[in-house]
């Protein structure tokens, strides 16, 4: 029964792979077969050994894609600010309440915020419950909106990777 389960999962993923990438070259068929078989085996072993670590890879990829998108968006905003003749900077300091508790999680969150142009992690409170962030742009002085963007954007994804 267990062997049948493996074959069904691999056959299903290979079929979806062929349907997704309709290419009739022999090399493409071998590549699809190899890749989908590898994914199927990883998926099956994740249930046997550690299901959580398998999905953490996808959460990490999601975090990296989100960070890259935010970095490019902020870079263009800062670059536009530099070349435009009129300044529209609305800078300020905010205290973001933290849900992350471990030192590594806090460090990664603070680093991601600091690497995004226009924001800088300044300090962490002694009880590790607040992260103080200097932001170059606080839209219309709406501090709560910026806090929500940090919490729903970076912090939520960091928590998903580590929990």
Ranges and model annotations:
Residues 1-79:
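Membrane-targeting alpha-helical segments
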Residues 1-15, 52, 56, 83, ...:
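Contiguous hydrophobic segments
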Residues 22, 49, 84-85, 163:
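Short helix-capping/hinge motifs at transmembrane helix termini and TM-loop junctions
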Residues 32, 50-51, 84-85, 129-130:
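Short, flexible segments with low predicted structural confidence
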Residues 61-103:
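Flexible, solvent-exposed loop/hinge segments and secondary-structure transition points
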Residues 90-163:
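Terminal membrane-proximal soluble interaction domains of membrane-associated proteins
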């Amino acid at each position: 029964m267990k062997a049948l389960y493996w074959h069904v999962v691999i056959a299903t993923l290979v079929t979806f792979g062929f349907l997704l990438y309709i290419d009739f070259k022999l090399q493409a068929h071998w590549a699809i077969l190899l890749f989908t078989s590898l994914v199927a085996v990883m998926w099956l072993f994740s249930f046997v050994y550690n299901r959580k670590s398998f999905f953490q890879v996808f959460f990490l990829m999601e975090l990296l894609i989100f960070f890259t998108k935010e970095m490019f968006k902020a870079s263009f905003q800062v670059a536009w600010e530099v070349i435009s003749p009129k300044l529209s900077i609305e800078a300020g300091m905010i205290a973001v309440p933290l849900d992350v508790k471990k030192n590594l999680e806090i460090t990664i969150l603070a680093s991601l915020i600091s690497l995004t142009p226009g924001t800088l992690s300044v300090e962490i409170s002694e009880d590790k419950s607040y992260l103080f962030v200097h932001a170059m742009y606080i839209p219309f002085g709406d501090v709560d909106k910026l806090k929500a963007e940090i919490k729903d954007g970076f912090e939520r994804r960091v928590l998903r990777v580590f929990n």
